[in-house]
Design a protein with these regions (language model features):
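Long, contiguous binding/interaction regions
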Residues: 1-45, 49-163
């Protein structure tokens, strides 16, 4: 099962490396990883997407909590949360394809952010399944390049990740 783990970590040299090393040393897979500063300049927030049984996820959170730089760990998938990911996709858009690509972008509430004679670059946001559905819906042969940020997540309602 997919889990989104939010980690508050001290902004220190090598902290990210130790977290990634922990996953690597224990054979855990990281599907995506995002890191950004928080409202507190001394802390960063990591969002780690990984898969595993409940026992594996419990072990991951225990190991993360043992790292000195880690301030707090929350498995967002244990409660209600909002997940978003950004995808930029460059597609061939020539002739009849232009209108079809524009229509598909509109259906998925994407934005065309760059236009050339032969291509569109489309920006899409949503959960991973929405972005995957867009990729399935368009002709694979028209995809020139794709980049995705990986998931970011936040608890819903009063649920917050703070020290």
């Amino acid at each position: 099962m997919k889990h989104i783990i939010a980690v508050l970590i001290e902004n220190e040299l090598g902290a990210l490396s130790r977290v990634v090393g922990l996953f690597s040393a224990r054979g855990y897979n990281i599907e995506s990883l995002t890191v950004a500063p928080t409202e507190d300049a001394s802390l960063s927030r990591m969002t780690i997407v990984t898969t595993g049984s409940d026992d594996v996820i419990e072990q991951i959170t225990k190991h993360l909590n043992r790292l000195i730089e880690v301030v707090k760990v929350v498995d967002l998938t244990e409660g209600h949360f909002t997940e978003r990911e950004l995808m930029l996709i460059k597609v061939r858009a020539v002739g009849k394809e232009r209108e079809e690509m524009k229509r598909m972008a509109d259906i998925f509430r994407g934005r065309i952010i760059d236009v050339t004679e032969k291509s569109y670059t489309i920006e899409l946001t949503g959960d991973s399944s929405k972005l995957d559905a867009f990729l399935v819906a368009i002709d694979r042969a028209s995809i020139l390049e794709t980049v995705r940020t990986g998931a970011s997540g936040i608890g819903r309602g009063e649920r917050i990740l703070r020290v």
